[in-house]
Amino acid sequence: MMDNQAVKSLLEMGIPHEVAVDALQRTGGNLEAAVNFIFSNELPEQAEMGEENDGSQPRISENKIVAGTKPCDVPNNGDQDIDMPDVSGVDVDYDDDEDITDERSGSNSTSGCRVTAQNYDRYSISETSIPPPSYSIVQHNEFKSNVGDPTVVLPLPLNSLIESYFGLFALLTAVYFPHVFLKPDFKDLNYRADWFKGSSFTEPKYRLAYCEAEDGSTTSEIVLASGPNEGLQPHLLWQLQKLISVVNTRKCERAFVSAKVFTSSLEPQLRSKLADSEHLYEVLPAFIKSLAVDLEMCPGIRDRETRSLFISSALHTPNKNEPPMETFLSLFHFLPEEYDSNLYKMFNVLLYPEEEEEEEDVIRGGEQEEARYVEPENTLKEVAPVLTILFNELETNTESVSLPNGVDIPLEFYPQLYTKQCKDQLIRHIISKRKQARTRSRCLLQEINELKSYQGKNISTILESTLAYLQTIPDDANNEAAKQIASLKDTLNSARAAKMEEYKDLASKLHGEWNLSHPETHIINTAKQLGLIENPYILTMAALSPYSYFIRSRNGAWSWIQSNTLGTEFKVKKCSSPSVVQEAIKHGTKYASETPLMFIYCEEGKIPTEEVVAEALKSNSGCLKFAEDDQNSLKTLRSQFFDGMGDPEQATNNINNGNDNDNDDDIDSDN
């Protein structure tokens, strides 16, 4: 058991309770080792070996329901024992947008996102898991029973896992940046009643035509097509505009759209890239770039205008003796071994390498001059309004990963803390202060220990024993000696108390105003006061897998969508509070996941209002017509139900009974 006195001792030093408990757990209750770990991040050899040799930790999270929780408290990752046809994926190379974190992954495993159904059978849902949803496409439940529910993007089977994430990214774009992609108006998107299935691709009646200007540049215009396509056409944009039309129409009744809508329109290079990729992080940047390039083909859109929406810039220094090079990235990705207790800690390791170097220097007892600071290995230059973060999936060579509390993904994130401007004007100063505080704290601990004991004996105990002895023989000499010893004791106590107060003050600052792992406690406010950061980035999507994802509406309401691995059944549940999403993420990140996890943040100031979206949709005649055609198609389908059932009221009830996913109770935040 943990020694309560040890916890109390750390609390008296100004260490937060959770930090104290964690440090004692890591060091087996050893107080001295715990203090050393807190300020130097150095574990005793035995503790480190114990962690390395612990092979008993599970590597797969089966998302079993914990006793006492409600069935809806734990997300279902969609794993089920099913047979399915073998659907092959297809598609190519974009070197522009290489992720600067690629160099860190170093993974050459042959197992990737293209997982077969047989592999998933080993991790089938247990009897205590959430029952499979009962929303059946076979029953033609294309209608929402509540028009306020989000339109769902249904995933593809497991052997097309990566493509399912394409659909989720497109959905996020359709919800949060429709006004950007509604700028080109193709007049008539050529509606077909089965468009939402993605089984076929239909081109609009108006397409792009290219002409060469006098200066040699090429311009485009939207014209009525008179024959076969000549030149590049924005196939992916057309499909995205169809989705935008539906999800942003008020009182839309379209319940779902298949992710196949987007895979059917991938251009050849992207198909080739997809065929050669084993991991989502390898091919998602190409999909994002393809979306942007499609829009930039259109008239009135400046080159690279759209790419800046998704693609951030960074400064990368491969060698400290070389100047930094600008590079571009559309996502960050982390290996399971790089999971940490919160997202800021994970970014710190990636983008604050000097912090790690300073810790090592303190451990060695060395000193570094301020002038030795050089450009960090990686730093952000500009952060795009859309920030995509991937947690890589479990692989055969993945080390055992176990985080008892999972990863804390904040609802509001400030990636601006990792820009060069913020690091130069604030973070370097904090890192320097942290280094000095750690060095001083270690000295104080040593000095306090020297004032407390000598050759393993407690000095206060010796002085008290001596005083007690002298007081048994009351003569002038002994009385004088007793006064001197009492004075010495008071001096020692005062010196110890002063050093302890200084130590507590440093500890408070390290875990408060200089805490890089929890910048929300102080650093973010300081950065705002200095004008270095403004808007937070809002968590808008959390995909634990394509079969279990959370999405936030523009007004802040969260929904949880679950589906089976065939993409034929799904459930929609309303979340009673955002904390439900955070708890689900923590549960899903306690161990390495079988599928990639995707988190998407959007800059608060760039999220459009309902009025802006409505105006953009109203101004695009092609999308407006498509939305009307889709709603008319659903009305026709509903009338066919009426004709078949005889009683219109009964027919409506039958449709709504099939949509029982829309009538589930809200997910309670009280677990």
Swiss-Prot record:
One GO CC term, this protein: cytoplasm
Compartment annotation: Cytoplasm; Nucleus
Major place of residence: cytoplasm
Domain UBA: 1-41
Keyword Nucleus: yes
Coiled-coil intervals, chain numbering: 432-501
Coiled coil among keywords: yes
Acidic residues compositional bias, start-end: 661-671
Gene Ontology biological-process entries: positive regulation of protein autoubiquitination; protein deubiquitination
Pfam families hit by this protein: UBA_7
CDD domains found in the cross-reference section: UBA_RUP1p
SUPFAM superfamilies named among the record's database cross-references: UBA-like
Gene3D superfamilies: DNA helicase RuvA subunit, C-terminal domain
Phosphoserine modifications at: 56
Other remarks on this protein: Present with 5930 molecules/cell in log phase SD medium.
Protein name: UBA domain-containing protein RUP1
Native source organism of the sequence: Saccharomyces cerevisiae (strain ATCC 204508 / S288c) (Baker's yeast)
Record lineage: Eukaryota, Fungi, Dikarya, Ascomycota, Saccharomycotina
